[in-house]
Each structure stands twice: as C-alpha cells, then as structure tokens.
C-alpha cells in the first residue's frame, strides 16, 4: 500500500462544525489544529470554510471533516444548511468578549435543532493567552457548560494550548457513544461513517471458523 493510501486509511469519519460569533478565532483554531501554526492574517470567514485531518483516538483512526462557519448574522441562513448531520461541534466564544459569550445560547439552540440528534458539543473559551483582558471567568463558563451538558476547555489558537485536545475530546465522546450503541454509523444523518479500515474488518470472514472435515483429518 502506498504512503498516500495509508495516510487516508481510517476507521471512522466524523462531520464536525466550528460555530460561534465572528471574531472569536474559529478559523484560527481550525488552522492551528490542522497546520500546527497560528494564522495571523485571518479575515472573517465568508460563508463556510473546510478542513480535514485524521487523528488517533484510543487506537482508532478518525477522519474529521470540519466545517468552519461564518459568525456574522448575514451569513446565518447559509451556514445553517451545513449543520445537518454534524456529529460534533466546537462552540467557540472569546474570553475577552462578554458579547460573544452572551450569544452562546442562540448558537447552541441552532446546533441542537439543526444538526444530528445526538450531536456532541464542546464549549471552547478561546484566546486564553489574553487572560489579562478576560471578561468571562472560567467558573462562569464552566457552569454554563455543566447546565447545558457540554464539555468545556479554554483554548489558545495563538499558542496551540488545548486546541488538539478539544477536537480529540469531542471525537472520543462520539466513539464512546458508538461503542455503547447510542450512535449508529449506518444511520442516515448521524454525521458518522465507517472508514475503509472499519469496512474491511466488518466484511472480512471470521477467522475463528471451525475447520472443515477435510482439514481436520478425522
């Protein structure tokens, strides 16, 4: 198998969203996650941007297809169409902007109404590197996350702190739901698909079959 083919082999594919107000650093989070560097010339997303990456979660290779949505109200009708069938989402606010935090409820309502029924969401308080300019405390956001059954991390797209961890935690919870039977990759609109590696395993005959009479030499 070629190196390219190997790099594209994965067990599952998850559709992810990155949502939240404009200026919270959503595109920078995506760029830091995929490229491992800060995108310092980032402009506001117009409509939707896309990125993908394969990660290892507990020995399973998961390909994340990530849709970075525009935060401006005028693009809301466009970006809502991309919510359908999302398995996971990063809900992002800026810890230095109370306004972006206050908008979280609206974004959360959209995600739970328009995406898949069992969408897994992690709340990300971005721009952790600007702690001296903080307007939203860790405790306040932590309570919001707990009340709304969200995971929660503070992140920094600039330094990379907790960026990969946010995506991995979200993916791990989705995997746990698959293993428990709560999520079915074969159900339409789940935001989850089996990858090539998992399909090969599902389709391969069981190795532990009883030997035939001819083989056993009876």
Curated annotation (Swiss-Prot):
Serotonylation of Gln-72 by TGM2 during activation and aggregation of platelets leads to constitutive activation of GTPase activity. Phosphorylated by CDK1 kinase during mitosis. SMART domains: ARF, RAB, RAN, RAS, RHO. The modification Phosphoserine is found at residues 190, 204. Mg(2+) binds at residues 27, 45, 68. It is found in: Membrane; Cytoplasm; Early endosome membrane; Recycling endosome membrane. Its cofactor is Mg(2+). Keywords: Cytoplasm, Endosome, GTP-binding, Hydrolase, Lipoprotein, Magnesium, Membrane, Metal-binding, Methylation, Nucleotide-binding, Phosphoprotein, Prenylation, Protein transport, Transport. Regulated by guanine nucleotide exchange factors (GEFs) which promote the exchange of bound GDP for free GTP. Regulated by GTPase activating proteins (GAPs) which increase the GTP hydrolysis activity. Inhibited by GDP dissociation inhibitors (GDIs). It is an enzyme of class 3 (hydrolase). A motif (Switch 2) lies at residues 70-79. One of its GO terms (molecular function) is GTP binding. A motif (Switch 1) lies at residues 44-49. GTP binds at residues 23-28, 42, 44-45, 71, 126-127, 129, 157-158. One of its GO terms (biological process) is protein transport. It holds the Pfam family Ras. The small GTPases Rab are key regulators of intracellular membrane trafficking, from the formation of transport vesicles to their fusion with membranes. Rabs cycle between an inactive GDP-bound form and an active GTP-bound form that is able to recruit to membranes different sets of downstream effectors directly responsible for vesicle formation, movement, tethering and fusion. RAB4A is involved in protein transport. Also plays a role in vesicular traffic. Mediates VEGFR2 endosomal trafficking to enhance VEGFR2 signaling. NCBIfam families: small_GTP (TIGR00231). Interacts with RAB11FIP1, RABEP1, ZFYVE20 and RUFY1. Interacts with SGSM1, SGSM2 and SGSM3. Interacts (membrane-bound form) with NDRG1; the interaction involves NDRG1 in vesicular recycling of E-cadherin. Interacts (in GTP-bound form) with GRIPAP1. Interacts with RABEP1 and RBSN. Does not interact with HPS4. Switch 1, switch 2 and the interswitch regions are characteristic of Rab GTPases and mediate the interactions with Rab downstream effectors. The switch regions undergo conformational changes upon nucleotide binding which drives interaction with specific sets of effector proteins, with most effectors only binding to GTP-bound Rab. This is Ras-related protein Rab-4A. The gene is RAB4A.
